């Protein structure tokens, strides 16, 4: 056929196949036999092979990528993908409800959704086309897994409308697909996956999309990052809107008028759990009103308007074979139970934390005891209690050693603490664990430097402190086991790139006691340079918001150690950045901006920058952002499709700006 006829036929085939895919994979209501679908697909493949320039990004033939990737690229999410706070019982839910109503009043409705046990992903669409998909990662930065996500038939390559949005969802492996996959792996003498979630995550992190395509993954989408710009007013309307756009949402959802109705519904949904064709690990409860969501806002880690109810952990009985001791980066000795492998909440468990010596004594835990194990929050395995009546006499009492199992130094118990510690700064285990912490995601975030590689570098005596990482050469690293030319080059490149990190990552990576990632950022933002922080007095540290006495003492102690100062000087000489690179926090009284000290509401869609960027810049100039319009609001900035907030501002005679006025003030 000629080129024009081929073009028209290809367009017709794409429309038809995408329609049939939607009916089959999303609606579960196929209107044609599989053979007819396959015939049309083969016809389209033939046309595109003959005329490659007719192949479009939304073609169903593009779902299975060809090339194997060398590595996943990093992706910064337009809006952070935060985790949810957890509730473990009805009282936790009532506490959540009480906090919500204290902030927004008693007129609250909740949208209740299943918590799918899979992998959280974001899907970026530009003008209606799927252009990028990513894992959640640390919530701010994920990995680009676009080609693998294209293999999931329920993800439309082209939406029903030409929108530029970021959709959030949970990719998962159906139970039937999981069972079939494990049967095949066992047949091929491969290790079976522990649970569907691990299988889904492992499939989406394959560098070869053809492997992901064989795994029969699925997805439920649950939100749009820019939902408040879509002309909808509630979470439940947002899910209906996603249905209209051609996405697959979970239909086991309901709007509830009270928390007691939510609690009753949870019992009903939990009873269905075993019969669902996919795994769930809880229920998500969200305030339905988007205005109320915005008013409630966020903590550093999670939204205040949503909570995840986690199902009670499964408890099983197994045998405690031994107790192993681990030395952490701060010298704490942690006993770990070695168990006869057993399935708990869908995952095979062979180890469980025993926390400390006091807990072992309190529960009278002995080696070879029969113990009850559960997963706390369905994540961390722990020993609940001992079945004393099943003891046979072969059990052995356990006592903590007096010397470090790694270096032989005397162990001490610091006053007021339950943990035993090794206080030898030269302890190999502490140094190794400190290195692992330094390169971790929330610290210096050095790709390719995981526990295995760090252990090799340490054992080969190539690295003894964090400064040594920046002295590594390609010639040294390539000698390590399982390190090829390309992986070595990537590792050296990642190490060099980490030199440019902002100060807060370095501070957290140094492992100063009591200084977590949030405190590290607070200190970096306040003092702006490592030099300023080193000189800070205890009084100056205590004057910083959220820095308490223990934190201040720990910082002073750290920077008074000669060996630490030498290490920091060496890092600076090696080119590691010691300045804060993030936005500066400006007090209202120190700003001459029009925004200083004003209460401001942003509404509608902005063209020149995202809402998060606008918020950050306004706050940097001393403005205070809130989610709802009231008589206390000083200014409303209205973008396109501003909606009810603009109307309310006009009714209350509140000053209203458009985007042009906003940009003018920001550019001053």
Curated annotation (Swiss-Prot):
Belongs to the NAD-dependent DNA ligase family. LigA subfamily. The keyword Magnesium applies. Residues 590-668 form the BRCT domain. DNA ligase that catalyzes the formation of phosphodiester linkages between 5'-phosphoryl and 3'-hydroxyl groups in double-stranded DNA using NAD as a coenzyme and as the energy source for the reaction. It is essential for DNA replication and repair of damaged DNA. The gene is ligA. It catalyses: NAD(+) + (deoxyribonucleotide)n-3'-hydroxyl + 5'-phospho-(deoxyribonucleotide)m = (deoxyribonucleotide)n+m + AMP + beta-nicotinamide D-nucleotide. This is DNA ligase. Its cofactor is Mg(2+); Mn(2+). It is an enzyme of class 6 (ligase). Zn(2+) binds at residues 404, 407, 422, 427. SMART domains: BRCT, HhH1, LIGANc. Keywords: DNA damage, DNA repair, DNA replication, Ligase, Magnesium, Manganese, Metal-binding, NAD, Zinc. One of its GO terms (molecular function) is DNA ligase (NAD+) activity. Its EC number is 6.5.1.2. The active site is at 115 (n6-amp-lysine intermediate). PANTHER family: CHROMOSOME TRANSMISSION FIDELITY FACTOR 18, DNA LIGASE. Transmembrane segments: none annotated.
């Amino acid at each position: 056929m000629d080129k024009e006829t081929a073009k028209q036929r290809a367009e017709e085939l794409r429309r038809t196949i995408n329609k049939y895919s939607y009916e089959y994979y999303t609606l579960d209501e196929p209107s044609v036999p599989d053979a007819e679908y396959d015939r049309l697909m083969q016809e389209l493949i033939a046309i595109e092979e003959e005329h490659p320039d007719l192949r479009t990004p939304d073609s169903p033939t593009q779902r299975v990528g060809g090339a194997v990737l060398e590595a996943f690229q990093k992706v910064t999410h337009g809006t952070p993908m935060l985790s949810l706070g957890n509730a473990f019982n009805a009282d936790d839910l009532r506490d959540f409800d009480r906090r919500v109503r204290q902030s927004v009043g008693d007129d609250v409705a909740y949208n209740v959704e299943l918590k799918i046990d899979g992998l959280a992903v974001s899907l970026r669409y530009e003008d209606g086309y799927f252009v990028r998909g990513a894992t959640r990662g640390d919530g701010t930065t994920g990995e680009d897994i676009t080609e693998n996500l294209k293999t999931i038939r329920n993800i439309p390559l082209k939406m029903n409308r030409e929108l530029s949005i970021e959709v959030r969802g949970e990719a998962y492996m159906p139970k039937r697909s999981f069972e079939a996959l494990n049967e095949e792996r066992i047949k091929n003498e491969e290790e079976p996956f522990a649970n569907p979630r691990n299988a889904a995550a492992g499939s989406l992190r394959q560098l070869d999309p053809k492997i992901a395509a064989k795994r029969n993954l699925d997805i439920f989408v649950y939100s749009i990052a820019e939902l408040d710009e879509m002309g909808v007013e509630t979470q439940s309307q947002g899910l209906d809107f996603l249905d209209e756009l051609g996405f697959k949402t979970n239909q086991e959802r309901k709007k509830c008028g009270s928390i007691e109705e939510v609690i009753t519904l949870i019992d009903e949904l939990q009873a269905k759990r075993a019969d669902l064709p996919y795994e769930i690990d809880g229920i998500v409860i969200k305030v339905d009103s988007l205005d109320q969501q915005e008013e409630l806002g966020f903590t550093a880690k999670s939204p205040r308007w949503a909570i995840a109810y986690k199902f009670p952990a499964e408890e099983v009985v197994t045998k405690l074979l031994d107790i192993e001791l681990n030395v952490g980066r701060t010298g704490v000795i942690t006993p770990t139970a070695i168990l006869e492998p057993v399935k708990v909440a869908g995952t095979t468990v062979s180890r469980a934390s025993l926390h400390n010596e006091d807990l072992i004594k309190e529960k009278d835990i002995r080696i070879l005891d029969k113990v009850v194990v559960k997963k706390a929050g369905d994540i961390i395995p722990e020993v609940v209690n001992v079945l004393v009546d099943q003891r046979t006499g072969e059990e052995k009492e356990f006592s903590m050693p007096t010397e470090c199992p790694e270096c032989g130094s005397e162990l001490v118990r610091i006053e007021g603490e339950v943990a035993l510690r090794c206080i030898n700064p030269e302890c190999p285990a502490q140094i190794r664990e400190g290195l692992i912490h330094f390169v971790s995601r929330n610290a210096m975030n050095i790709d390719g430097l995981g526990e295995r590689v760090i252990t090799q570098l340490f054992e080969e005596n190539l690295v003894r402190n964090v400064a040594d990482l920046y002295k590594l050469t390609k010639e040294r690293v390539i000698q390590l086991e399982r390190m090829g030319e390309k992986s070595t080059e990537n590792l050296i490149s990642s190490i060099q790139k980490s030199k440019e990190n902002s100060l807060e990552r370095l501070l957290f990576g140094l492992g100063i006691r009591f200084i977590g990632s949030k405190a590290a950022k607070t200190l970096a933002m306040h003092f702006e340079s490592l030099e300023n922080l080193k000189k800070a007095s205890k009084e100056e540290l205590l004057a910083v918001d959220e820095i308490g006495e223990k934190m201040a003492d720990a910082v002073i102690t750290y920077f008074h150690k000669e060996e630490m100062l030498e290490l920091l000087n060496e890092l600076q000489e090696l080119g590691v950045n010691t300045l804060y690179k993030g936005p500066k926090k400006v007090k209202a009284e120190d700003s001459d901006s029009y925004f200083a000290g004003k209460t401001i509401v942003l509404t509608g869609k902005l063209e020149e920058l995202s809402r998060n960027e606008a918020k950050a810049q306004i706050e940097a100039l001393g403005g205070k952002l809130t989610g709802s319009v009231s008589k206390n609001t000083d200014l409303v900035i209205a973008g396109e499709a501003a909606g009810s907030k603009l109307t309310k501002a006009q009714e209350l005679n509140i000053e209203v700006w458009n985007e042009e006025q906003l940009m003018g003030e920001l550019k001053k």
